[in-house]
């Protein structure tokens, strides 16, 4: 909140936010179908639509239908909009999440490996426990607490065996510990680490000239990863956290374009990093195949610019 908002008394704030009692009642699948039809949606096969509504919640499907609305207030659909188009979008989004999640997995494992190798050679096996190597003591303290929690929750045999055998230091060495912490914790650890020379070394292994780009990208990847893990809609999502985009990079890249609020730029960061991990560029070929399988998807709504397929990164 801005300071001006923070001191608003409670009753006044209710007036600002438009607090109302929520009075919508739950409705069954037959009523859901009728409601969609009343709003102008064409349903080609009612039996299949009902089956889908029993397995995918109405609210989840509605988030794909929003894209077809003519007016947001009454939720009337544009002429010719069909339930099947929404299901297509839903299935496209689901496959897209799976591809992205798989690519992020490779980046995540690679980042862990580089942090273990590069930071340990200089700062030893327990560098992540040395507060003098980190900036912002409070944030670091919180990060270390998370590491302790995540290690104690881990069911990995190598963690259990380690704690049965050794009592000091209180955590296993970095090559064990970093394998079980979350990507969010890993990226915080990287961002809080003080030795910028080593961070630059890690960034360069990903083809990035400055560590600040890597920090920005892994923060965005953490958010994207969580969206995928929680099955959130991502195809036309607007991301609050935007990746820093260099104009030029040593490997295949894109021309500087509009503001990076949509998925396109997030995909570009994944593709760029993938070039340094798997030379066969799995994600790119899978994405191009997916776009061919769903030719009706509006790539512009995902932030894809005119002529994107001619960019060096996508060729």
Residue ranges and their predicted role:
Residues 2-315:
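Long, contiguous internal "core" modules enriched in hydrophobic/ aromatic residues
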